């Protein structure tokens, strides 16, 4: 059984009324990035579900602390 992991995800979207792509960082806990899709969509409602993942990584350490 896979344990849930902490993901740091860079989201991109071009919300209505914007001329250039915007970005935001999303943190979520799940078994995969795909599992976090509903939370990512809810996190950025102005994008109306039209978001994409530019980058992500699993957070395993913060400072001297293991995650």
PLM regions: where:
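Short, mixed-charge low-complexity intrinsically disordered segments
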Residues: 44-67
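Short aromatic-glycine-(Arg/Gly/Cys) micro-motifs in beta-strand/loop hairpins
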Residues: 1-22
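Domain-level signal for compact, non-enzymatic binding modules
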Residues: 8-10, 33-35, 66
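A short, exposed loop/beta-hairpin motif centered on an aromatic-Gly-Thr core
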Residues: 21-31
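A short, charged, amphipathic alpha-helix used as a generic interaction element across diverse proteins
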Residues: 32-48
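A structural feature that tracks compact, well-ordered secondary-structure segments
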Residues: 11, 25, 41-43
């Amino acid at each position: 059984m896979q344990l849930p992991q902490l993901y740091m995800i860079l989201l991109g979207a071009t919300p209505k009324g914007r001329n250039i792509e915007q970005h935001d960082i999303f943190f979520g806990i799940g078994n995969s990035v795909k599992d976090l899709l509903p939370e990512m969509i809810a996190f950025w409602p102005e994008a109306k579900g039209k978001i994409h993942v530019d980058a992500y990584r699993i957070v395993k350490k913060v400072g001297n602390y293991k995650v």
